[in-house]
Amino acid sequence: MSVTRGSAGDLRKGSYVILDDEPCEVLEVSKSKPGKHGSAKVRVEARGIFDGARRSKIFPADALVEIPIVDKKTAQVINVYGNVVQLMDLETYETFELPLPEDPELASRLKSGIEVEYWESMGKRKIVRTRGGV
């Protein structure tokens, strides 16, 4: 699994964290001051990268959290058929299939020969945007 560990107190908006075994992008972080008996707490609001679900969790500020490694790669669309997009990675020349993105605007721009950016983390992949000003 492509993860590292980091302190919950170091999380920032826009960083990534694993919540409920799902890689998530941090939307908001709020910290509470330590009391007389107890450590500071960090409340993390995040959205799943692949499923879009919002998640919230509270950690002690010094707790270790898992941070996913999100690889941002480029691929070329080979074919679009039905609800499936066939892609070829431009570095490894590996071909693979992904479901058509849920965003109708992005899905309408996917044509054979177009380059796209896709994210890969924890064995999952997702088309994020088209490349090259299209």
Curated annotation (Swiss-Prot):
Keywords: Cytoplasm, Hypusine, Initiation factor, Protein biosynthesis. This is Translation initiation factor 5A. HAMAP family: eIF_5A. One of its GO terms (biological process) is translational elongation. One of its GO terms (molecular function) is ribosome binding. One of its GO terms (cellular component) is cytoplasm. Its main location: cytoplasm. The modification Hypusine is found at residue 36. CDD domains: S1_aIF5A. The gene is eIF5A. Functions by promoting the formation of the first peptide bond. It holds the Pfam family eIF-5a. InterPro entries: IF5A-like (IPR001884), IF5A-like_N (IPR048670), NA-bd_OB-fold (IPR012340), Rib_uL2_dom2 (IPR014722), Trans_elong_IF5A_hypusine_site (IPR019769), Transl_elong_IF5A_arc (IPR022847), Transl_elong_IF5A_C (IPR020189), Translation_prot_SH3-like_sf (IPR008991). SUPFAM superfamilies: Nucleic acid-binding proteins, Translation proteins SH3-like domain. It is found in: Cytoplasm. The keyword Cytoplasm applies. The keyword Disulfide bond does not apply. Belongs to the eIF-5A family.
